[in-house]
């Protein structure tokens, strides 16, 4: 007989479980059925599952459904899960069939077996403390798993919001630093009219501020939880008093202003609150990818590109070209954006795929949503510290572009008319002569007038340059 294992059984039969393991037979079945991604459950979701199980045990004790001795051991075991002590025991793949039953049962089994151990009983002695009858009392996967995900997503969103605020503030600092730096504005990747580098960076900061607000606003619908809905939202096997009490405990232990959804069937059927979050994340990454593209273009060179800004050198850029340095931080921002776009499509498809009283595709939906939030938080932290803070302006190069640009003819347009200005611009392009030289050559404007009109700083705010 193998003494390194214990035997657990369910209505499908028996399974060998490693003797030291806190998970049980249903977790083992899940690992056999779903070796899909190679990933484990996110630590924040494990913590949230602990909060759900602790809150449920306390509420069930308060309404007289759960034996107090059993309940106290469940609470102690759940506290250890919340602390992250047993993260290594959560071994199921996050993408799975069954609407999250395997994740829920992984939590139930770990908490039950640890509670048994604390009680002085052998793991697997479910006649004393059962994963289903005790740890999962008054619950279904269909309310426990989404509620845990709401808590995890809210916690991760708060981290993302703080990180994004920090990045936004650093963009504003750069806007102030570059407030007097003149450069050429571009439309269609062609020279347009002068702009201040600080104006560009402030525009970046402002769009990020809107993203912060958009993301923050999505939290409101996540505060509505369906705990107590049980299987289909009707609350079967959940005492009405339990629903109220468990919601209070969940709000207390999670630190979020959670409330019971007004209509539990609606809250169990529908997943629009997650697609709303994902949409806000996608919009944010659309904006961040655009900013990353701008930075890569401005930093192109250093000799044969724009070379308007200098990004911090983070690592050698080529295994064959000595001395080459690449814009790796904007590049990783682009790649995170692409991942978030793909995740959003998955979330959209999964959200649409629900039928009747439950969306069974929630595991892939939650996996992608949590991944999007996590990788955005990570990339914003790294980008801010390793790139944004160290960006330098190549002021001489930008000034040279402005002075050589034909785009400044736009400022002359109100003084000489569009047709004359267009002829001057065309000749400047063909001959290489400057706009200033051609204006003097043809007597279109005087030197004094040109000094006022062609002051590039006068072109960076509303008004007609040279008109007092």
Swiss-Prot record:
The impact of changing residue 322 to A is: Almost no change in catalytic efficiency
GO CC terms in record:
cytosol
Instruction: Provide the effect of residue 321 to A.
Output: 338-fold decrease in catalytic efficiency
**Impact upon substituting residue 326 to Q:** 168750-fold decrease in catalytic efficiency
What is the annotated temperature dependence of this protein's activity? Optimum temperature is 65 degrees Celsius at pH 7.5. Thermostable. Retains 80% of its activity after a 60 minutes incubation at 55 degrees Celsius.
The annotated subunit structure for this chain is: Homotetramer.
Q: Do the record's keywords include Lyase? A: yes
The role this protein plays is: Catalyzes the reversible conversion of L-aspartate to fumarate and ammonia. Is highly specific for L-aspartate in the deamination reaction, and cannot use alternative substrates such as D-aspartic acid, alpha-methyl-DL-aspartic acid, beta-methyl-DL-aspartic acid or L-glutamate. In the reverse reaction, alternative nucleophiles (such as hydroxylamine, hydrazine, methoxylamine and methylamine) can replace ammonia in vitro, leading to the formation of N-substituted aspartic acid derivatives.
What's its catalytic activity? L-aspartate = fumarate + NH4(+)
Effect listed in the UniProt record for changing residue 188 to A: 100-fold decrease in catalytic efficiency. Does not result in any major conformational changes
Reported uses of this protein in biotechnology and industry: Aspartase is mainly used in the synthesis of L-aspartate, which is used in the pharmaceutical industry, parental nutrition, food additives, and is one of the principal ingredients for the manufacture of aspartame, a low-calorie sweetener. Aspartase from Bacillus sp. YM55-1 has several characteristics ideal for application in industrial processes: high specific activity, relatively high thermostability and no cofactor dependence.
For the ligand (L-aspartate), the binding residues are: 101, 140-142, 187-188, 319, 324
Impact after mutating residue 101 to A: 7100-fold decrease in catalytic efficiency. Does not result in any major conformational changes
Name the EC number(s).
Answer: 4.3.1.1
The record's annotation in InterPro entries points to: ApsA (IPR004708), Aspartate_Ammonia-Lyase (IPR051546), Fumarase/histidase_N (IPR024083), Fumarase_C_C (IPR018951), Fumarate_lyase_CS (IPR020557), Fumarate_lyase_fam (IPR000362), Fumarate_lyase_N (IPR022761), L-Aspartase-like (IPR008948)
Catalytic residues (positions): 318
Consequence of substituting residue 320 to A: 50-fold decrease in catalytic efficiency
Any Gene Ontology biological process: tricarboxylic acid cycle
Q: Could you say which protein family the record assigns here?
A: Belongs to the class-II fumarase/aspartase family. Aspartase subfamily.
Q: Outcome of mutating residue 318 to A, per the record?
A: Loss of activity
User: Which parts of the sequence are annotated with region: SS loop?
Assistant: 317-326
Q: Which domain of life is it from?
A: Bacteria
Supply the name of the protein.
Aspartate ammonia-lyase
């Amino acid at each position: 007989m193998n003494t390194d294992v214990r035997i657990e059984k369910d209505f499908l039969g028996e399974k060998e479980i490693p003797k030291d393991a806190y998970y049980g037979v249903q977790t083992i079945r899940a690992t056999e059925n779903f070796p899909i991604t190679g990933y484990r459950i996110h630590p924040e979701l494990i913590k949230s599952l602990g909060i759900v199980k602790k809150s449920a045990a306390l509420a069930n004790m308060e309404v007289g459904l759960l034996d107090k001795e059993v309940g106290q051991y469940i609470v102690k075991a759940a506290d250890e899960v919340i602390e992250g002590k047993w993260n290594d025991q959560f071994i199921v793949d996050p993408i799975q069939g069954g609407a999250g039953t395997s994740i829920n049962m992984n939590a139930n089994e770990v908490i039950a077996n640890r509670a048994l151990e604390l009680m002085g009983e052998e793991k697997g002695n479910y006649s004393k403390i059962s994963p289903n009858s005790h740890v999962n009392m008054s619950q279904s996967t269909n309310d426990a798993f989404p509620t845990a995900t709401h808590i995890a997503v809210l916690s991760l969103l708060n981290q993302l919001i703080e990180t994004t605020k920090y990045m936004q503030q650093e963009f504003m600092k750069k806007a102030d630093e570059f407030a007097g730096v003149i450069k050429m504005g571009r439309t269609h990747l062609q020279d347009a009219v002068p702009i201040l580098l600080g104006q560009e960076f402030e525009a970046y900061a402002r769009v990020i501020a809107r993203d912060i607000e958009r993301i923050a606003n999505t939290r409101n619908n996540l505060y509505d939880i369906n705990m107590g809905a049980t299987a289909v939202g009707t609350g079967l096997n959940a005492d009405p008093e339990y629903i109220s009490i468990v919601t209070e405990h969940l709000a207390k232990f999670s630190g979020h202003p959670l409330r019971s959804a007004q209509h539990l069937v609606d809250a169990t059927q529908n997943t629009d609150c997650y697609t709303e979050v994902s949409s806000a994340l996608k919009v944010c990454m659309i904006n961040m990818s655009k900013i990353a593209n701008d930075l890569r273009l401005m930093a192109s060179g250093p000799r044969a590109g724009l070379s308007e800004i200098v990004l911090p050198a983070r690592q050698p850029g080529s295994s064959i070209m000595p001395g080459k340095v690449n814009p790796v931080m904007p590049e990783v921002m682009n790649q995170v954006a692409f991942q978030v776009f793909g995740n959003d499509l998955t979330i959209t498809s999964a959200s649409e795929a629900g039928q009747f009283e439950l969306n069974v595709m929630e595991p892939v939906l939650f996996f992608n949503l949590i991944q999007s939030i996590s990788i955005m938080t990570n990339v914003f932290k790294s980008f801010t510290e390793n790139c944004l803070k160290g960006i330098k302006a190549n002021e001489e190069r930008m000034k040279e572009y402005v002075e050589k640009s034909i785009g400044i003819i736009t400022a002359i347009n109100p003084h000489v008319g569009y047709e004359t200005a267009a002829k001057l611009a065309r000749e400047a392009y063909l001959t290489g002569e400057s706009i200033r030289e051609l204006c003097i050559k043809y007597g279109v404007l005087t030197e004094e007038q040109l000094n006022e009109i062609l002051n590039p700083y006068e072109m960076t705010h509303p008004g007609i340059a040279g008109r007092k």
